[in-house]
Amino acid sequence: LQNSLNFIDGLRIDRALKFVWQAAPQWTALSTLLLIIESVIPLATLYIFKLVVDHLTGTNASIESGSDFQSLSILIAAALGLAILSNLCNALLGYANEMQTHLVADHMQHLVQAKSINMDLAYYEHPKSYDKLHRAQREAPSRPLRIISGMTELALNSLTLVGAFALLLMFDWIVVIVVLAASIPVLIYRIKYAEALYQLHREKTASERLSRYFNEVITTAEKAKEVRAFGFGPLIANRFSEIRLMIRASLHLISGQAYRRQFITESTAAFAGYGALAFIVYATVQKSISLGETVMYFGAFQVAISSLRPTLSGLAKLYENNLFLSTLYEFLNVPKSVPDPLHPMAVPRPWRSGLRVENLSFHYPGTDRPILHDIVMTIRPGEIVALVGRNGSGKTTLTKLLCRLYDPDTGQITIDGTDLRNFKIEDLRGEISVVYQDFGRYHMTARENIMLGRPDIAPDDPSIVQAAQWAGIHDYLIRLPKGYDTVMSRTFADGEELSIGQWQKLALARAFVRDSQLILLDEPTSSFDATAEFEFFEKFREMARGRSALIISHRFSTVRLADRIYVLDAGHLIEQGNHEELLALDGVYADLYRQQASYYQDESQSVNNNNIPALSTAFSK
């Protein structure tokens, strides 16, 4: 069944043609016209040579003997004109194909990017999904280009071949049948090879991804410090080599078998072809055809043979490229698991009763382990809420559900009583600012990094500077050589490398520039020093005034600022209240607080013994 599906995919040339036409309709039309003209020129040239030979041998009655040189000059001039026209068409065709290539490659990349932008986060929970994405990314840039060049060569050779066969049919249809029949095994073997190659690449996708990952580990700056500090570069390089050796061994096995079959089938076709040529020679000896016709048929035979091999190869390559391109279609056709509603409602602005989580339960796709169980919580307008719990208790997962990166298994999340699933996803997320623990580090200017939080604002919008001031990164940025227009990476000219704490401040600025009604901060000061953390939260209430905020933190100096605190434990919401109420409850929150407080007390005692004030005591005041 799979082989049948692969064969059908390989024949779906219409999909590739559709992409090519969508990307470059004018250049495609021009290429088609030039191909038709260029395919006719060799046949017209052959006919002219026939007339020349017949004239020289006196067998062309249509040419008068008194004007030999003039007639020959006209024929030679016509042949020269066709040669110049062929050169012109060839040059224009090369230019048109180059324009097509760039346009189609960009179009295909745009399709992959557009699909990736709207892909549900759940898609990335499965290794097979990464395989699909890898295949789409690998094939999207190159396969359309190969299809364009392949279709160009195939069309040119096919049209030329048809014309050559038309001339040979004037001699004897047996010649055409013999040549075609001998070519069928060649085409079959090439198609089988394309299918085997395609199947191998599908089976080895995970291995190819792993080898690419190992290559990135030892060739990019991200892991460079640890690679050198621990000296494990050669180990990773060996792992890379082992995987590539395994992939090459499989490829060599398939290729070796294929090329043995190629030799046998093409040799058989050669015997048949030259047998047909001998038939033409025999007819000439028997004087069944004129010498001019012999030259024309010999030329037609040479054109047919020289066009037949690339035609068969082109058909097989087109089949192969369509097979590989089917991986792109497979990716583009992945359905959404978090869809927009058919009839979306407007997101309330301002929120009145706020956001409410009602009996929410959730587990990640592809797993059986529940992450959240029957969660009930409320975030009122203008309220700062903290979420506390041990690692793995489900805190970050809850923020993903609030942004509707996933939908709950049971229960619902509402804004002013309306389920989030009734809002257009883009509109909902436009009302939320979020900073995750694994915030993005974009190798763009500082200004552009902040503007990503609100792409519609102008580069000189004052809210950019205001957001940077709230995040505590403004003073650093204005001291850079190009200020806010400095690229945040040394991988580009005149760039600067940020510390992890500075990157986190830039991520906070990106969230604060957004005109949203809910701010979600997941460990927002995890990379701050004590002074920076203190200064940040001094400004936070001013920045968040009129907005709701949910803060996830393990630092109780941060948590105690909240109006209300929820405590998660193993996916269950077990406690809620303010700082004093939860301490009085003497439950999980109080236990976590005492553990952290004991550390600070020990630190404070150690520092005070040396008559040095502890910064950490500032957060207990």
Q: Which role fits each region the language model picked out?
A:
Residues 1-14, 101-145, 207-250, 322-335, ...:
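Extended non-transmembrane interhelical loops and adjacent amphipathic helices
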Residues 232, 276, 297-333:
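Cytosolic ends of transmembrane helices, especially the final helix of ABC transmembrane type-1 domains
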Residues 10, 46-53, 109-113, 126, ...:
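Alpha-helical transmembrane segments of polytopic integral membrane proteins
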Residues 348-621:
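ABC-type nucleotide-binding domain
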Residues 1-42, 61-75, 93-97, 114, ...:
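Membrane-integrated ABC transporters
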Residues 28-92, 165-197, 271-278, 282-298:
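Transmembrane helix-loop-helix hairpins at lipid-water interfaces of multipass membrane proteins
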Residues 52-55, 91-99, 103, 107, ...:
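Membrane-spanning helices that line or support transport/gating and their immediate boundary helices
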